[in-house]
UniProtKB/Swiss-Prot annotation:
One of its GO terms (molecular function) is phenylalanine ammonia-lyase activity. It comes from Oryza sativa subsp. indica. Gene3D superfamilies: Fumarase/aspartase (Central domain), Fumarase/aspartase (N-terminal domain), Phenylalanine ammonia-lyase 1, domain 3. Contains an active site 4-methylidene-imidazol-5-one (MIO), which is formed autocatalytically by cyclization and dehydration of residues Ala-Ser-Gly. The modification 2,3-didehydroalanine (Ser) is found at S200. The keyword Hydrolase does not apply. This is Phenylalanine ammonia-lyase. GO terms for cellular component: cytoplasm. Its main location: cytoplasm. It is found in: Cytoplasm. It catalyses: L-phenylalanine = (E)-cinnamate + NH4(+).
Amino acid sequence: MECENGRVSANGMSGLCVAAPRADPLNWGKATEEMTGSHLDEVKRMVAEYRQPLVKIEGASLRIAQVAAVAAAGEARVELDESARERVKASSDWVMNSMMNGTDSYGVTTGFGATSHRRTKEGGALQRELIRFLNAGAFGTGTDGHVLPAEATRAAMLVRINTLLQGYSGIRFEILEAIAKLLNANVTPCLPLRGTITASGDLVPLSYIAGLVTGRENAVAVAPDGSKVNAAEAFKIAGIQGGFFELQPKEGLAMVNGTAVGSGLASTVLFEANILAILAEVLSAVFCEVMNGKPEYTDHLTHKLKHHPGQIEAAAIMEHILEGSSYMKHAKKLGELDPLMKPKQDRYALRTSPQWLGPQIEVIRAATKSIEREINSVNDNPLIDVSRGKALHGGNFQGTPIGVSMDNTRLAIAAIGKLMFAQFSELVNDFYNNGLPSNLSGGRNPSLDYGFKGAEIAMASYCSELQFLGNPVTNHVQSAEQHNQDVNSLGLISSRKTAEAIDILKLMSSTFLIALCQAVDLRHIEENVKSAVKSCVMTVAKKTLSTNSTGDLHVARFCEKDLLKEIDREAVFAYADDPCSHNYPLMKKLRNVLVERALANGAAEFNADTSVFAKVAQFEEELRATLPGAIEAARAAVENGTAAIPSRITECRSYPLYRFVREELGTKYLTGEKTRSPGEELNKVLVAINEGKHIDPLLECLKEWNGEPLPIC
């Protein structure tokens, strides 16, 4: 088949014609380029951008991390690039000139939406009426949950300025400067939490920013000290001179007819989602460490054969954390000692964690790029094309990229939370956790210590709510505005629900992190107690089994090696609270060693001087006298910081997170003997995560990673 108009055959075969390779008019190439490099490097870039003190905007290069920084009302200040002033003025002048020339333009000389058949020459009055009728939100008392969080409002203000700076919207530069001054003075308009469908933009909430700028009597803002102020006081605090703005034709529409509230909140949500995704990868590796897992699940060949980049990177990050881990070296020795101590393969929550997390990372990363495109887009209507002298009537206000990206992100967050809950459930269950105590109980009396039982119930609650939030918002569209807005994106609603999901994932991450630190401490106790038990048993064995009553060597001395094997095979916390109890396995198994030796002793058992059976009572009596004290001394030494064997965590790449939780945040090892509750400790972690304090220790765990999996060899 011969193709025309410069087109070529698809795959060099006849049948279908496709465009010849050329520039990137459809933007697919740029979208692909944005996904190159590792996700971790992208997160590091975000963190660096978040910490910059100045956010200079000109309409085309705003990043979600910058939005998050300004939204947080920290030190980041906003500056408008002067290069945008001329083009913004040109579009504003074009609107005024076209109206004076009698040109009929939507929202300038016409009514709005389904009533755009109406006409008027009173352009300023039309803009005032637009703001008035869009002020349809409800605030309740102002303190009962009906006000959009200030962080989301600040994000919306920044994004709206950025989109208007491109000069296609017909608004004065001075209005944008005024909004920037409000941001820099930390004066935040009060916007209603609900009332937008993010199609024709976020009309209702954005109208309250316009209301403040124009000095409406019902306009309210929050001052830097948290007090409520009116428009005049807001302008005074922000240092805005010249009084309120009298809107010119198109300016009200330019302010409200955009997607900035949905995309602004989405930006702050995605900044956190990207970091929490990295945290989930690292915590999965720590989970492997404390569970004595098998690190082969991270082997690069497995993931290379699956091809998915998110999975490959997740596995490589976990592989990096586990490479050289002291826990993994110890786990390997345990496996060699007795391969039947645990299943040949770890359960899915560990073994398939890269396969589970990988697609979620890909979704979050794609959503991040989609929202970054959105916050740098011109998304109102009509668009003023000064170069061609026309107003283009379209639908860039349709916030579908926001709704879809947020639905997808929320589903990814729910999946991350589900994995975290599965890992947590294994960790606290002594049927699955390879020797750790039930509920990670850290005290001496398990009958009076139920550890993380309440935390597991809370985690189930968090996970259930998170799975509910994983349901889509965008399939609940209702036709609005006299069936003019008959399809709409629900972008802000989806962003709000995703923000809720992020909060829940933070709760789960905090709880899991505290539990992992508890498990690290329990492994430290376990190793020291086991060493003390071995030493005690060997001392008792030498004292009671080595010789007979005449001082001659006794055959029972050959039991020592088998006694040590039984100690190695037995979980410390299965007997540590009462090591000499015959209801627990340790004493039974030690006795069995002696019994088996006695059964093999033949006729010598009939002689009191050579009988092994005759030694059992003395051996057990001596153990009962010394073993409990040895175990208590070992536990006390760990608690006092004088342990004979140091904690393995200090030799691991995951140590910065442990150090952060234990030393910087001051959390403690939890036991039923103390009054400190799990909630008190995990709340310290939650507050720290909300403040971003976890970011540096998290990235420190990965500072040596070169961005590649280990070679296959």
